[in-house]
Amino acid sequence: MALLPSSISASEFFTPVVLSFQVAAVAGIVVIILGTLAGAWMSRASFFGKTALETCFMLPLVLPPTVVGFILIVIFGKHSFIGQAIEWIFQQPVIFTWWAAVIASAVVAFPLMYQSAKTGFADIDPDIQGAAMVDGASRWKVFIHISVPLAYPSLLTGSILSLARALGEFGATLMFAGNIPGVTQTLPTAIYVALDSGNNTLAWAWVVCIVVISFLMLFFIQQKKTH
């Protein structure tokens, strides 16, 4: 490929790139759905323990990624109930698999989507939603046709930020999913291995790739904010 140095094959370069996008896409879909629903609920809910629950939602944002990875290993490990149940159902453990990379990326990206969604839904005038329900609309219809469109700017921002975070996840993925080429080796882990092995040319190629992608994502958000 003309854009790549002659010492780098297209397959060698694109394998972790494609894998990263696949992992980020699936993790992003999960995070967008769960983050939107959790944000909508928490923006209006009032119950004992709400602050504690919200703190748990936001913890992955401040915890070191290695700690997140360790917690995931404990939760999904062979000695845990969840880990044993998954291994019994699917005949293999989840640790060091493609799905482990998805789970790790989703966990660290969730707080960004949740916080954006909560802010967007909290800014909606409750009277607008109440008027629609008085006219006979169900809660689900009000949510889909009124709440989501009104919160769309915040939801879009949260979606892009969470996708970017999932794409750039390193520590939790390395601990929980490992660094298996073609299976769990995403761009961040591939860059680390390339640099550690002295392959600076390949590392630079991947660094430029992820910087450009991240720049375009953030640029898109800024463009939307100014229009």
Swiss-Prot record:
One of its GO terms (molecular function) is molybdate ion transmembrane transporter activity. GO terms for cellular component: plasma membrane. The keyword Nucleotide-binding does not apply. Its main location: membrane. It comes from the Bacteria. The chain crosses the membrane at residues 17-37, 57-77, 94-114, 142-162, 201-221. It is a multi-pass membrane protein. The keyword Nucleotide-binding does not apply. Residues 17-221 form the ABC transmembrane type-1 domain. SUPFAM superfamilies: MetI-like. Belongs to the binding-protein-dependent transport system permease family. CysTW subfamily. could be part of the binding-protein-dependent transport system for molybdenum; probably responsible for the translocation of the substrate across the membrane. This is Putative molybdenum transport system permease protein YvgM. It comes from Bacillus subtilis (strain 168).
